């Protein structure tokens, strides 16, 4: 019975086990297999879809980028071609429009070139060239003028005149014309016209007239007056005096340096004029060594006497320029020989001169005679002195030999003497005028 029970139990145990095994195993296997297959299929399909979608999407992107690049390149090419086509068309249009304008411009430059060249050739057209609106053209013309002046000055004159001619750019156009004319002329003519710069054209003409009149009066006067003119050149007429002295002197040792000093005189009045006047001053000192030192007139008296020498009042006001020069020059230049009464008796007359000038002259004439009386010097000593020395030309020849050595060794006593003698001149008018017999002559001439 136990066996039966055991078998039945075993069968029962076995059967459910078999069922459980069969049911469990296929269920598990079946489910897993199905799931796996389905999942695999789904996954494959999804993967393929993704791949296809991604591939399509990538292809679309690539296509879009390629088409965009191609479009941009195509647009650029089209724009470049259009610009190339438009540029020549626009250039042609502009050239066609501007065709008359360049013709006018081509016609204008020759005129401007001639306007620039003509001032260099003919100095008469310097003024319109300078009045142009552009400052550059003015500077070019000025530089050309300065270069021409410097070149001609180096060829014709010493280095001192080059510096003076370099400063001629600031002159008026009329004076530039005159300087150009002087450059074209030979060197002798330029020496004769040594100082054309600071003198206006009107004063130049009047100086020439004054020189002609002075030459006529010098022929009438005695050797005394010639010596006085040579020994004491007037500062108001430097041209005439310097030219006469240069022509009469036989030894032209230093003409270039003297002409250079004459031109430099217009710029530096005090220093160079003292050097230039040193030669006649030394002659005057040699003449007056035997006599007392000459009188030194004051500035006003010297101006009035210079006015009496000139032919008319207007020429003296225009030619003589005493305001520019300091009063030291007038005090240094000895004027005793020039203004002696014997010369006035021979040269002056009531017909040749205006009465207004004579009203100014008697003051300095009386002063000259009274100063000689105060110093106890006779009036007749002047011709004796010139006779003893041997004439004015001998003095000039002797003095010229000593000029090269003693031009710059002028004694300082002559500069100090005018200051010491000025109070004497103030006291002179108190002396009575009746003692001089020659003053009666001049009072008669005045009235």
From Swiss-Prot:
Modified residues (Phosphothreonine): 217
Record field: compositional bias (Basic residues): 59-78
Compositional bias (Basic and acidic residues): 14-25, 35-49, 306-316
A GO cellular component annotation in the UniProt record: nucleoplasm
InterPro entries from the UniProt entry: Hemogen
GO biological-process terms attached to the record: cell differentiation; regulation of osteoblast differentiation
Major localization class: nucleus
Region (Necessary for nuclear localization): 7-86
Modification Phosphoserine, positions: 89, 122, 200
Localisation: Nucleus
Stretches for region Disordered: 1-91, 137-156, 210-280, 306-337
Keywords assigned by UniProt, alphabetized: Developmental protein, Differentiation, Nucleus, Phosphoprotein
Entry's transmembrane regions: none
Name assigned to this protein: Hemogen
Gene from which this protein is expressed: HEMGN
């Amino acid at each position: 019975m136990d066996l039966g029970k055991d078998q039945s139990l075993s069968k029962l145990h076995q059967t459910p086990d078999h069922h459980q095994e069969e049911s469990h195993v296929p269920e598990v296997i079946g489910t897993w297999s199905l799931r796996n297959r389905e999942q695999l299929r789904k996954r494959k399909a999804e993967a393929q879809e993704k791949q296809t979608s991604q591939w399509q999407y990538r292809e679309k992107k690539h296509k879009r980028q390629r088409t965009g690049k191609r479009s941009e390149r195509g647009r650029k090419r089209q724009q470049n071609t259009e610009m190339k086509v438009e540029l020549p068309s626009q250039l042609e249009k502009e050239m066609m429009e501007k065709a008359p304008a360049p013709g006018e411009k081509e016609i204008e430059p020759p005129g401007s070139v001639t306007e620039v060249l003509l001032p260099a050739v003919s100095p008469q057209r310097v003024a319109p060239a300078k009045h142009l609106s552009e400052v550059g053209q003015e500077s070019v013309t000025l530089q050309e003028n300065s270069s021409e002046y410097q070149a001609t000055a180096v060829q014709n004159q010493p280095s001192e005149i080059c510096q003076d001619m370099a400063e001629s750019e600031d002159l008026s156009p009329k004076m530039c014309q005159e300087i150009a004319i002087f450059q074209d002329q030979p060197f002798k003519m330029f020496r004769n016209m040594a100082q054309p710069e600071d003198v206006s054209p009107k004063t130049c003409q009047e100086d020439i007239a004054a020189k002609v009149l002075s030459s006529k009066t010098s022929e009438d006067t005695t050797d005394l007056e010639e010596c006085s003119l040579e020994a004491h050149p007037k500062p108001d007429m430097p041209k005439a005096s310097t030219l006469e002295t240069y022509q009469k002197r036989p030894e032209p040792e230093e003409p270039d340096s003297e002409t250079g000093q004459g031109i430099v005189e217009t710029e530096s009045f005090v220093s160079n004029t003292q050097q230039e006047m040193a030669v006649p001053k030394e002659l005057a000192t040699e003449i007056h060594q035997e006599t007392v030192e000459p009188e030194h007139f004051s500035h006003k008296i010297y101006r009035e006497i210079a006015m009496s020498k000139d032919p008319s009042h207007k020429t003296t006001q225009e030619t003589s320029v005493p305001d520019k020069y300091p009063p030291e020059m007038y005090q240094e230049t000895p004027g005793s020989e020039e203004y002696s009464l014997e010369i006035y008796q021979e040269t002056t007359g009531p017909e040749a001169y205006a009465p207004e000038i004579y009203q100014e002259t008697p003051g300095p004439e009386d002063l000259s005679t009274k100063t000689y009386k105060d110093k106890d010097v006779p009036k007749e000593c002047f011709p004796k002195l010139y006779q003893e020395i041997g004439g004015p030309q001998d003095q000039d020849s002797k003095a010229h030999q000593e000029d090269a050595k003693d031009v710059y060794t002028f004694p300082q006593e002559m500069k100090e003497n005018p200051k010491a003698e000025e109070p004497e001149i103030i006291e002179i008018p108190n002396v009575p005028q009746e003692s001089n017999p020659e003053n009666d002559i001049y009072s008669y001439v005045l009235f």
